[in-house]
Amino acid sequence: DSKGKLKIFCMNIEALSTTRGFKGATEFLYHHPNNIAIIDESTTIKNHKAIRTKNVLKLASYSKYRRILTGSPVTKSPLDLYTQCNFLDDKHLGFSSFYTFRNRYCVTHKLDLGGGKYTEIPKYYVHIKELEEKLSKFSYRVTKDECLDLPKKLYSKRYIDMNEDQEKFYEQLRI
């Protein structure tokens, strides 16, 4: 008798970028309400504008239990955390949208893309301790040193020549 048992459906995260994959996952979760959704390599859902991320967030409402796993350090950008945490529970961070989250934890710089188009890019991050406190209430982190015996990293500098347009764009990013 499988009544009451947790249902597991395994699928590649990339499939959720497709209509067919999203539909299949939705049908499974809908018909098996006692389920768990686990996103491995959860940084694949860090872009709040991506179709895959939007689909994953829609699926969250059909999932009884939700978990995320990642081997990537959290420190790359605090903005990467919003949709990952939102998948787990949209109340964890206390923000109704990515933009309110970004405005709390990031100071941005307007970047001219040319042709009258602009985008906001992070200049620096603020209130990081506050964010870490929120994360500590629902996350668990293990470092490589705590679980793996790896040799020390080797670093080498690589210098790349840029053309004039690349140099100009690079300088805009550094501001």
Question: What are the roles of these predicted feature ranges?
Answer:
Residues 8, 36-37:
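Hydrophobic "anchor" residues on beta-strands that sit immediately upstream
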Residues 40-41:
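Walker B catalytic acidic pair
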Residues 64-78, 86:
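Conserved helicase ATPase motor motifs in RecA-like P-loop NTPase domains
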Residues 78-82, 102-103:
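Conserved AAA+ ATPase core "coupling" helix
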Residues 10-15, 24-33, 50-64, 94-175:
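Inter-lobe coupling linker of SF2 helicases/translocases
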Residues 44-47:
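Residues immediately C-terminal
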Residues 81-97:
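A short helix-turn-beta junction within AAA+ P-loop NTPase domains corresponding to the substrate/partner-engaging
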Residues 1-9:
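Conserved motor-coupling elements within RecA-like helicase/translocase cores
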